[in-house]
């Protein structure tokens, strides 16, 4: 936990504990954290569905004293900045009345619990966070419609685009993340450091990541990785993983792992893998679409490879391409990465290396591989060196899904593909060009790269793939896919600076000259500021 950030937030955290708003750093089980009796927002699902976020919790039944922070500055720090809001203490709701790039000079550390970040409230083209990462090292966090595009290329400081050591009651919704230098996203455990005692690494609990994009990790150090995620009481639903070499995602915690209705495109040598002998995997109705880098033999020429891929794509012969050209599994013995759904891992200690968890793997589509689509256990589950598919099934297969907090509407894999491409990521206030080109590349089966794309030259780069791998979708520099667009927007009129624009307040019978009404609780259980940030139609209309 970051010392400076903690010292800054601690007075409010301590005061909150005396007021019935606890900080629970020792949490290790889903039941250790109290949850709300209403959803974090309409449409919230899974383990993080009942996060308190910026509304806060009160065990003493006293009035909740939440605060609204309005981001009006794109600076790294100071009044009106995102850092000021995130690194404060106490329950808080963060809204935006500025559009553009927030370029961080150092990471933002969110250490105090009870925060909601509403990226959908930014005017115009919205906001994007670049330069450094935003670390969530606490509990009861809601983050929606926010773009994280770190983009820094100093390999001595290889951080993710977003993530952290989350404690629990966390939900990410409709976020877009790219250009990380380790993973694009990490969220699976936290560290409980007791005074003069060994640190405990504990699972993140009650976590949901839904409707998000994790794409284009920067491959400057063989680490263009998608995500390391996990936790207890988890749900990862309707997300897109695209153009990452590995960890799409990596299951970084034991226990339940519920991965439903996601789309995975253009991985190189790893799709989903991880877990251990205590894992219970639900891998349900996801859509896997190999791309030009999937199974790529790094000794081959990129230009010849992409030419062969384009030819096969045009003729509808990608099955033949993957079974004859990629160098992956073509000897008929080793299973191919091109149709891998899951590579489960065995026990983590020397004493249980022959022990495996259990997996319910069903309804997943692997494009171009009809046999694996018909029966996901016909090559789609690939643990290391334990025999053929019958042996694998006898050790790992569960015939029924494990109980979990499932989405209200579990779609088929084909329905997931259509839904995800139409809806995923920070689509409000509007989808930016970075996401648009990623999505179009998935549709086309051909990742986009800029006409003026050039090899990134760095004395610190260490890679297995060729320098021009951007032609296959694996980049080392954001400029290879067009770079960061300009985000424009005009601030809304908010006379009392309570985070709710005058026109919205008038339309909802509130007083635009009264700054206290934003945090007033309504009969719905939500504060007025929450009703505002959840009014997505208002933001879609460009108001």
Predicted segment positions?
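Extracellular beta-strand/beta-solenoid scaffold signature
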Residues: 129-134, 155-164, 179-204, 220-231, ...
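Extracellular calcium-associated, cysteine-rich motifs in secreted modular proteins
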Residues: 476-543
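Extracellular beta-strand-rich, repetitive "passenger/adhesive" scaffolds
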Residues: 120-127, 146, 513-517
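Right-handed parallel beta-helix
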Residues: 114, 119, 139-150, 168-182, ...
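Extracellular beta-rich repeat passengers
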Residues: 1-12, 16-22, 253, 258-477
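Acidic Gly/Asp/Thr-rich repetitive segments characteristic of extracellular carbohydrate-active
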Residues: 42-94, 517
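N-terminal pre-domain segments of enzymes
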Residues: 1-64
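Extracellular beta-strand-rich solenoid/capping regions of secreted or surface-exposed proteins
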Residues: 83-90, 102-116, 127-144, 150-167
């Amino acid at each position: 936990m970051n010392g400076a950030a903690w010292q800054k937030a601690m007075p409010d955290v301590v005061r909150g504990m005396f007021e019935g708003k606890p900080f629970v750093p020792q949490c290790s089980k889903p039941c250790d954290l109290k949850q709300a009796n209403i959803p974090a927002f309409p449409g919230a699902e899974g383990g993080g569905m009942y996060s308190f976020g910026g509304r806060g919790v009160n065990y003493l039944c006293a009035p909740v004293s939440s605060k609204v922070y309005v981001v009006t500055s794109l600076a790294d720090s100071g009044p009106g900045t995102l850092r000021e809001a995130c690194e404060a203490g106490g329950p808080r709701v963060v809204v935006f009345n500025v559009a553009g790039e927030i370029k961080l000079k150092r990471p933002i550390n969110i250490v105090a619990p009870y925060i909601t970040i509403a990226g959908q409230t930014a005017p115009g083209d919205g906001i994007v966070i670049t330069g450094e990462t935003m670390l969530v090292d606490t509990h009861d966090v809601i983050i929606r419609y926010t773009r994280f595009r770190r983009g820094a290329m100093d390999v001595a400081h290889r951080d993710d685009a977003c993530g952290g050591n989350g404690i629990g009651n966390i939900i990410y919704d409709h976020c877009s993340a790219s250009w990380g230098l380790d993973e694009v996203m990490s969220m699976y455990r936290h560290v409980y450091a007791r005074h003069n005692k060994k640190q405990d690494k504990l699972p993140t609990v009650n976590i949901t990541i839904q409707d998000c994009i994790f794409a284009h990790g920067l491959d400057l150090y063989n680490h263009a990785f998608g995500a390391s995620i996990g936790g207890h009481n988890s749900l990862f639903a309707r997300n897109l993983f695209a153009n990452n070499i590995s960890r799409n995602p990596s299951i970084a915690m034991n226990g339940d792992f519920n991965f439903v209705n996601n789309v995975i495109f253009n991985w190189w040598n790893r799709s989903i893998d991880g877990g251990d002998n205590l894992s219970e995997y639900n891998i349900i109705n996801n859509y896997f679409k190999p791309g030009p880098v999937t199974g790529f033999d790094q000794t081959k020429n990129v230009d010849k490879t992409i030419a062969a891929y384009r030819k096969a794509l045009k003729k509808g012969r990608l099955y033949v391409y993957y079974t004859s050209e990629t160098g992956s599994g073509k000897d008929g013995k080793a299973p191919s990465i091109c149709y891998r759904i899951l590579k489960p891992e065995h026990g983590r200690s020397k004493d249980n290396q022959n022990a495996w968890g259990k997996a319910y793997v069903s309804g997943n589509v692997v494009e171009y591989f009809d046999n694996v689509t018909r029966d996901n256990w016909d090559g789609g589950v690939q643990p290391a060196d334990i025999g053929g598919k019958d042996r694998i099934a006898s050790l790992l297969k569960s015939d029924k899904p494990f109980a979990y907090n499932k989405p209200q509407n579990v779609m088929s894999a084909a329905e997931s593909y259509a839904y995800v491409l139409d809806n995923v990521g920070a689509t409000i206030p509007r989808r930016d060009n970075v996401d648009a080109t990623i999505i179009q590349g998935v549709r086309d089966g051909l990742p986009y790269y800029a006409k003026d794309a050039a090899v990134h030259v760095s004395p610190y780069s260490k890679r297995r793939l060729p320098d021009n791998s951007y032609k296959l979708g694996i980049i080392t520099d954001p400029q290879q896919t067009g770079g960061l667009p300009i985000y424009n927007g005009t601030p809304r009129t908010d006379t009392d600076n309570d985070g709710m624009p005058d026109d919205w307040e008038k339309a909802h019978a509130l007083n635009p000259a009264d700054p206290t009404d934003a945090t007033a609780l309504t009969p719905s259980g939500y504060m007025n500021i929450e009703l505002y940030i959840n009014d997505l139609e208002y933001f879609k209309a460009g108001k």
